Amino acid sequence: MTCDVSPLFGTDGIRGRANFEPMTVETSVLLGKAVAGVLLERHSGKHRVVVGKDTRLSGYMFENALIAGLTSMGIETLMLGPIPTPGVAFITRAYRADAGIMISASHNPYRDNGIKIFSSDGFKIGQAVEERIEAMIASKSFGGLPEDHAVGKNKRVKDAMGRYIEYAKATFPKGRTLKGLRIVLDCAHGAAYRVAPSVFEELDAEVICYGCEPSGCNINEGCGALWPSIIQKAVIEHEADVGIALDGDGDRLIMVDEKGHIVDGDMLLSICASDLKRRQALPENRVVATVMTNFGVLRYLESLGIQVTISPVGDRHVLQHMLETKAILGGEQSGHMIFLDYNTTGDGIVSALQVLRIMIESESTLSDLTACIVKSPQSLINVPVAKKVPLDSLSNVQVVLQEVKEILGDSGRILLRYSGTENICRVMVEGTKKHQVDSLAKTIVDVVEAEIGGAEISE
């Protein structure tokens, strides 16, 4: 196999099908060396890097490959085992490590895998560092190799999950419990399969678990945040108070109310923003949302006197805008929620705890908390594509977009964009009438499929 390294990094780290470039063992060893090289450029001496993963079968080989590359350069590595992505960010800070690495393809199917890299402060590395890593791999110039006793060693951190569990519980008010709440929890057979049940059970909730039996090949398969229909049915069947669905690496959250209705990231953001403003704990009454955020949600937030900064899609962009505007809360429709008071990245478990706290303190059901939020009709369809051709170069697509815009007028909008992590084109149409937006979205989808449709191939 050859090492095609240009470019390695996408919108959320490195991602692709396991054993296909860039997600090969060979490239992962080089990546480990390059991360070490960047650290050693900053200062010589000892460095520590923590390495976590989700439950994919291919995680074992990438874990070993990355650790081999790092230790060959004299870096000490701390192996965390299966743990949510926000757990890696937290433990990187807690252990005063120089970097953290998470091996995961998030919500993608098990055949894919990916690598996310965190700096010592727990934030994902920036573009400049990514480019330096890519340059090192391209040139295979990492600096001198250590000799004899100077090579690095690897240690397994036995209490990594326990540390993260205690951290997550500490974001819930002391003296309060979840006693009396029946929760349906879907962990997508992913990284949170042991952590999440423990957090909620130790806070005295009754937890009914789904998606907590990973096989290495079933992560995100018909379950988790991408398939909330599982917990919709389960909440009704078990007469539960709430449903919680996480994705494969535990950084996304979708909830279901006691009536079986989905509460997506837009609505969860609204609930938490409203609570923070009520408690006068929302700096400048500002939150960050994305271009996908429902217009009805934006109107609701604005009616509360909350200013909304709009960012491109992706938790990286949300975080960047949060830092620029000094916001402490941001999120997106897909379920990424960032509470900067607690963590440096999206955290599904911590986000769920904040919503549960609001329910308990206000003595409200989840449906009570969403009752005053009226969403605009919106249709979102994912179209698998053979390859990502620039959309403005597709004349038939541009023609149908213009036709749909004229039909919607000022009462609606269209958003057409490629996924940053999969070979998918996302078609979103929003308006005032549900049947109309569904029909118009289907019209656009038909043209996109005719132009560039194909079997789904993850990046």
Swiss-Prot record:
Keywords, sorted A to Z: Isomerase, Magnesium, Metal-binding, Phosphoprotein
Active site (catalytic residues): S106
E.C. designation(s): 5.4.2.10
Enzyme kind, highest EC tier: isomerase
Membrane spanning stretches: none
Pfam families (UniProt xref): PGM_PMM_I (PF02878), PGM_PMM_II (PF02879), PGM_PMM_III (PF02880), PGM_PMM_IV (PF00408)
Disulfide pattern: none
One MF term in the entry's GO annotations: magnesium ion binding
Reaction equation(s) it catalyzes: alpha-D-glucosamine 1-phosphate = D-glucosamine 6-phosphate
Cofactor(s) demanded: Mg(2+)
Post-translational modification Phosphoserine, affected residues: S106
Gene Ontology annotations for the cellular component aspect, listed alphabetically: cytosol
Post-translational modification: Activated by phosphorylation.
A biological process from GO: carbohydrate metabolic process
Sequence positions that bind Mg(2+): S106, D247, D249, D251
Cofactor binding note: Binds 1 Mg(2+) ion per subunit.
Purpose: Catalyzes the conversion of glucosamine-6-phosphate to glucosamine-1-phosphate.
PANTHER family referenced in this protein's UniProt entry, alphabetically: PHOSPHOGLUCOMUTASE (ALPHA-D-GLUCOSE-1,6-BISPHOSPHATE-DEPENDENT) (PTHR42946:SF1), PHOSPHOHEXOSE MUTASE (PTHR42946)
Family the UniProt entry places it in: Belongs to the phosphohexose mutase family.
HAMAP family: GlmM_B
Protein name per the record: Phosphoglucosamine mutase
Record lineage: Bacteria, Pseudomonadati, Chlamydiota, Chlamydiia, Chlamydiales
